[in-house]
């Protein structure tokens, strides 16, 4: 019934016109009626085409109120979104400022800590130097005065110091202690006088005997080229002269003025003893002393070799630890790159869970920072051990190979090879630049750049194409090792591309007899046809 009544009213146009919104509201609850209206509206009468369309009615108060409410609500949403974005920006700025302050404070604390360690090291060295000078002064004074207890006390302090330094009592430890003891009893004052010379000048026979037993040389020259025997004879100390002659003092040695101990003897008895002394005994004792010195030199050399061997083993162990740290750091870098790629993928595909990926990136960055510190510490420890090894074997030290140049000169040195240094050397250049400017320079040159910390760059196919492109177009192939020693990883990836490729690339065997053609694949395309490789480009 309702559909029949509603139809004519809608078609005749005599009833009150409805707004589109009100019409929808009127027909929303009656689907059959709405469909009937649509059918009848789609088949109007012939007379309706000639009639003028009726103008829409003005919006009602309800419509106006709805529009006002919608505008106000949208303004509220916009203000709230603006406030949220402003708050996020302010939080971001505050966080960046906080991080900058923390980084600055961390840098200041790091510099302060380094300065404190350096200051403590310098203070310890200065304190050790003062203590050494004090022991030397005490030993010289005790020798002149004949204070045997003080001499033994000084030597005991030296033994205790070596014990604190970790010197043991094994064969090497005993050799080091003997060297230190001999060096102590043969110390010199500002004039070059030794404790034995001071004891001779003071006429202290017992001190002379004790110092000789400890390994002191009786024929050293001090101020004005005077020997201990010269000073004892000049002072008229007969017993001291006799004791010095017994331990091997040579009465034939001259001072700087050309005088001998016999000539400056202040007592006739002293001159008589020196004149009547059998020089054959002196010759025999000199031979014995020379043999003893040779034995000590051999022991010192043996100890030096053992010490160098020990340090070499230590360096090898530290090198293994450093390589382990570098490998862990490389894995951490790869993990960080994977996390970044996962985050970018989530953002591109609107997959959500970006908070989780960001947290994973933060965790990976923290892991990288920790491993960087460990790797840096291992590198510093290894460098100090290598320095100690070089100090132990200075004769094996060679001049540093290579050529030092500024970054502004890299284009002439690497790209143009001015002077044909690289061509004459026959090896591929290795650029070492702690500042990283050389890597930036090479990255923006016309090179095939491979970042060894990027797993995508280390894919075998990418390395193969980079190498082929370098040979085909005469472009440099650059492996950027960054701050990590990844050369073994590069070699491993080259071996994955082709067995023996790393060695063939290093010794230039890849260029001989067109060996590079083995890298070609059927899918490479016509630009990599064997005829496209030119000899002039291969030589570069």
Curated annotation (Swiss-Prot):
PROSITE patterns: ANK_REP_REGION, ANK_REPEAT, IQ
Protein name: IQ motif and ankyrin repeat domain-containing protein 1
Coiled coil: 281-388
Extent of the ANK repeats: 191-220, 224-253
Keyword S-adenosyl-L-methionine in annotation: no
Domain IQ: 62-91
Region of interest (Disordered), ranges: 1-62
Residue spans of biased composition, Low complexity class: 1-17
Record InterPro entries: Ankyrin_rpt, Ankyrin_rpt-contain_sf, IQ_motif_EF-hand-BS, P-loop_NTPase
UniProt keyword annotations, A-Z: ANK repeat, Coiled coil, Repeat
């Amino acid at each position: 019934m309702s559909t029949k009544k509603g139809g004519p009213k809608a078609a005749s146009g005599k009833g009150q016109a409805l707004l589109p919104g009100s019409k929808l509201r009127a027909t929303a609850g009656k689907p059959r009626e709405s469909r009937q209206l649509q059918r009848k509206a789609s088949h109007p009468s012939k007379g309706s085409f000639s009639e003028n369309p009726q103008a829409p009615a003005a919006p009602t108060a309800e419509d106006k109120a709805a529009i006002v409410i919608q505008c106000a609500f949208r303004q509220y949403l916009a203000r709230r979104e603006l406030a949220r974005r402003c708050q996020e920006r302010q939080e971001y700025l505050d966080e960046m400022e906080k991080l900058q302050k923390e980084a600055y404070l961390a840098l200041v604390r790091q510099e302060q800590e380094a300065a404190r360690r350096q200051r403590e090291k310098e203070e310890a060295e200065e304190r050790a130097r003062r203590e050494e000078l004090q022991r030397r002064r005490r030993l010289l004074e005790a020798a002149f005065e004949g204070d045997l207890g003080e001499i033994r006390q000084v030597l005991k302090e030296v033994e205790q110091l070596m014990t604190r330094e970790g010197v043991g009592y094994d064969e090497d430890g005993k050799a080091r202690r003997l060297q230190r003891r001999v060096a102590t009893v043969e110390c010199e004052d500002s004039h070059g006088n030794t404790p034995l010379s001071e004891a001779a000048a003071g006429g202290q026979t017992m001190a002379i005997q004790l110092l000789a037993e400890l390994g002191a040389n009786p024929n050293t020259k001090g101020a004005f080229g005077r020997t201990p025997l010269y000073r004892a004879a000049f002072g008229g100390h007969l017993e001291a002269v006799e004791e010095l002659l017994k331990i091997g003092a040579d009465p034939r040695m001259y001072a700087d003025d050309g005088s001998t101990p016999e000539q400056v003897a202040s007592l006739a008895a002293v001159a008589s003893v020196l004149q009547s002394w059998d020089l054959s005994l002196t010759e025999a004792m000199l031979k014995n002393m020379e043999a003893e010195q040779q034995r000590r030199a051999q022991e010192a050399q043996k100890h030096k070799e053992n010490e160098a061997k020990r340090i070499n083993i230590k360096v090898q162990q530290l090198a293994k630890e450093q390589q382990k740290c570098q490998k862990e750091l490389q894995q951490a870098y790869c993990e960080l790159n994977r996390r970044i790629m996962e985050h970018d993928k989530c953002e591109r595909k609107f997959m959500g869970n970006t908070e989780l990926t960001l947290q994973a990136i933060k965790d990976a960055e923290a892991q990288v920072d920790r491993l960087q510190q460990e790797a840096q510490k291992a590198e510093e420890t290894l460098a100090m051990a290598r320095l100690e090894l070089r100090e132990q074997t200075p004769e094996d030290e060679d001049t540093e190979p290579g050529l030092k140049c500024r970054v502004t000169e890299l284009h002439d040195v690497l790209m143009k090879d001015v002077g044909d240094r690289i061509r004459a050397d026959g090896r591929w250049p290795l650029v070492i630049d702690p500042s990283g400017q050389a890597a930036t320079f090479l990255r923006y040159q016309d090179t095939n750049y491979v970042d060894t910390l990027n797993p995508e760059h280390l894919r075998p196919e990418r390395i193969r194409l980079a190498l082929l492109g370098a040979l085909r177009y005469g472009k440099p192939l650059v492996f950027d090792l960054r701050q990590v020693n990844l050369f073994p990883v590069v070699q491993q990836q080259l071996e994955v591309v082709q067995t023996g490729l790393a060695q063939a690339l290093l010794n230039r065997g890849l260029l001989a007899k067109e060996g590079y053609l083995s890298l070609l694949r059927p899918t490479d395309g016509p630009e990599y046809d064997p005829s496209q490789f030119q000899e002039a480009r291969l030589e570069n």
